[in-house]
Amino acid sequence: MQVAELIAPREFRLTEQDLDPPAAGEVQVEVHAVGICGSDLHAYHEGAVGDTPNQYPMVLGHEPAGRVVATGVGVTGWSPGDRVALEPALYCYHCEFCRSGRHNVCANIRFLSNPGVPGFFRRRVNLPATNLVGVPDSLALETATLVEPLAIALHSLKVGAIQKDETVLVLGGGPIGLLTVACLKLAGAARIWAVEPVPARREMARKMGADDVFDPHETDIVREVMAATGKRGVDCSIDCAAKEDTTNQAIRAARNAGRVLMTGIHSEVRVPFEISPMRRKELSILMVRRSNHESHDALQLLLDHGARIAPLVTHTRPLDRIADAFRIAGSYEDGVGKMVIC
């Protein structure tokens, strides 16, 4: 099968590799589509994701959809030809966190596309049957790649305990930020501010449901939010951009006893926070770690509200043009929202 390996920062190599038949309890899936995530771009450009350095060669990609081609011994409920989205995390199910339902912080988690665990920029993969989510014929597999990032957006709303009629500021209009805006709108947020420097993505934010959209290079975001809320601030700030300035804007824009939700992944290992307003306002600073079995809810959201969410997928490229795909996605060319490798 064809595999795209990252062998150095900004350098892919296409290889041919064999794949064993699926083991007991596993399903083999032919990968038809994989979205490029922001963390893939970090690994590609920077040689690391946060404090986790790349280990070359490595296979990125963790937003997959495809078709079942074979099943291992003991697998029931799946047959060749079934259309599926795939959860990319492998949990142990026996640590204290798994036993308490916090699978996303499993002590023994293995995440496909992390160093040492090949991801989905390849033609076939074996996975536990429990990692499959059935996709109906009515949903394009390219659109089904949104299940994984949409699950993260849904999980972030749970972590932030977002309530109907609350005010929310979303910093960053990449795919996760845009999906967060869509989820907030569908959850009944009273007013949503979105901040994004790329014009095409600001327009997408409006279509996803943002009430107010700003260019951070032209607008003092905190002043704008404070003026609109009578100097109160928002109930929750969500930092999907993960930059020093966006994190501190999120802190300054939050109301007293408000929440700051950090969904994005900072490139820097250490980021200076403005600690005084955090203490003075007694803010709750909340971190988001991927998702926690929200994939089925994400799929249902796509089926129910596809007209709003599906247009996020704007570009596709074949696997043998993966370098071109990463160049476009990383430079925000041509109005790119979500780039999908097919």
Give the ranges of each region predicted by the language model.
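C-terminal hydrophobic helical "lid"/dimerization subdomain
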Residues: 1-3, 248-252, 292-342
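Glycine-rich beta-strand-centered segment in the early N-terminal region that forms part
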Residues: 20-34, 49-96, 136-138
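NAD(P)H dinucleotide-binding glycine-rich loop of Rossmann-like/cofactor-binding domains
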Residues: 92-171
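Mid-domain Rossmann-like dinucleotide-binding core that forms the NAD(H)/NADP(H) cofactor-binding site
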Residues: 139-218, 223
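Glycine-rich cofactor phosphate-binding loops and adjacent beta1-alpha1 units
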Residues: 160, 203-284
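Residues in the short beta-alpha loop(s) of Rossmann-like NAD(P)-binding domains
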Residues: 198, 266, 291
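Rossmann-fold dehydrogenase core element
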Residues: 259-261, 273-312
